[in-house]
């Protein structure tokens, strides 16, 4: 079938609309990346590459730009969270993206954890796990 569509460059790419969860994850990724006041070109390239690899490059690029244009608002991310798993997923992703080396990043994570209503001890555990995983990668 693919051979019959060789002259159609869009064939095989995802064309279904991106669901709300993916939109929220992209926004969380971008918000975390810009939590220190700006988003680095390298980080934006990594995000866009991941969108392409997921087969959502065109829609993904729009989502990334929309998230960049949004004010950094943890309440916006937390607004439509339906369950504990979604809240933990957003917080984990945000912690994985951020290397806390600036007070603005720490403040953002604290505000996000509060907006998601994640208890402090759970947040501390997630952050510790992420630090250990990052450390094991660099060793």
Swiss-Prot record:
Database matches in InterPro entries: TerB-like (IPR029024), YebE (IPR007486)
Taxonomic superkingdom: Bacteria
Alphabetical list of Gene3D superfamilies matching this protein? TerB-like
Family, per entry: To E.coli YebE.
Instruction: Please state what the protein is called.
Output: Uncharacterized protein in ampR 5'region
What organism is listed for this UniProt entry?
Yersinia enterocolitica
């Amino acid at each position: 079938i693919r051979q019959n569509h060789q002259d159609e460059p869009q064939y095989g790419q995802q064309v279904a609309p991106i669901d709300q969860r993916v939109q929220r994850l992209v926004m969380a990724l971008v918000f975390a990346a810009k939590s220190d006041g700006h988003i680095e070109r390298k980080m934006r390239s990594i995000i866009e590459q991941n969108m392409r690899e997921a087969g959502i490059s065109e829609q993904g690029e729009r989502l990334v730009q929309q998230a960049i244009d949004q004010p950094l608002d943890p309440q916006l991310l937390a607004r439509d969270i339906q369950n504990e798993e979604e809240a933990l997923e957003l917080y984990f992703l945000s912690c994985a993206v951020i290397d806390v080396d600036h007070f603005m990043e720490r403040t953002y994570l604290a505000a996000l954890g509060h907006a998601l209503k994640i208890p402090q001890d759970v947040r501390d555990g997630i952050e510790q796990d992420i630090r250990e995983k990052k450390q094991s990668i660099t060793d």
